[in-house]
C-alpha cells in the first residue's frame, strides 16, 4: 500500500493526520510540510466525499476520525453541500517555499 510514513510510528502518524485534517476542515487552510500536506489532502478528500451524502452512518464514520464534533457538523452542513456537484478535487496544494530552519518544502493546503 502506498502512503507516507512521515518518520513516525503508526499511532503517532495517524494522530498527526487526524489533527491536520481536523484543522484543515475547521480553518479552511493549513501550512505544513509537503509530505504531510499530501497525506492530509488524501484523507480530507475522502471525508468530503463522505459528507456529500448526509446519513447517520456517514456522520458516525466522520466522527470516528475527526477530533471535534463541531467540525463534523460543519463538514456535513457547509462543506459537503458546497461540493455536491463536484466529482473530487476539493483541495489544492500550493508550494510556498523552503522552511528557514531545515529547508523542508512548505505548502499551503486549502479548500477550494
Swiss-Prot record:
Q: What keywords would UniProt list here?
A: Ribonucleoprotein, Ribosomal protein
Q: Which organism is it from?
A: Carboxydothermus hydrogenoformans (strain ATCC BAA-161 / DSM 6008 / Z-2901)
Alphabetically, the GO molecular function entries are: structural constituent of ribosome
UniProt cross-references to Pfam families, sorted A to Z: Ribosomal_L17 (PF01196)
Q: Which HAMAP family match?
A: Ribosomal_bL17
Q: How does it assemble?
A: Part of the 50S ribosomal subunit. Contacts protein L32.
Family to which the UniProt record says this protein belongs: Belongs to the bacterial ribosomal protein bL17 family.
Q: Which GO terms describe its biological process?
A: translation
What gene is this protein translated from? Answer: rplQ
Q: Which Gene Ontology cellular component terms are annotated?
A: cytosolic large ribosomal subunit
* Annotated InterPro entries: Ribosomal_bL17, Ribosomal_bL17_CS, Ribosomal_bL17_sf
UniProt-recorded name of the protein: Large ribosomal subunit protein bL17
Amino acid at each position: 500500500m502506498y502512503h507516507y510514513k512521515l518518520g513516525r510510528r503508526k499511532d503517532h502518524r495517524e494522530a498527526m493526520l487526524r489533527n491536520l485534517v481536523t484543522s484543515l476542515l475547521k480553518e479552511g487552510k493549513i501550512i505544513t510540510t509537503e509530505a504531510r500536506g499530501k497525506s492530509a489532502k488524501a484523507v480530507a478528500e475522502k471525508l468530503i466525499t463522505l459528507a456529500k451524502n448526509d446519513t447517520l452512518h456517514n456522520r458516525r464514520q466522520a466522527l470516528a476520525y475527526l477530533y471535534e464534533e463541531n467540525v463534523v457538523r460543519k463538514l456535513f452542513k457547509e462543506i459537503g453541500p458546497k461540493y455536491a456537484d463536484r466529482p473530487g478535487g476539493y483541495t489544492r496544494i500550493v508550494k510556498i517555499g523552503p522552511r528557514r530552519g531545515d529547508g523542508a518544502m512548505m505548502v499551503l493546503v486549502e479548500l477550494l
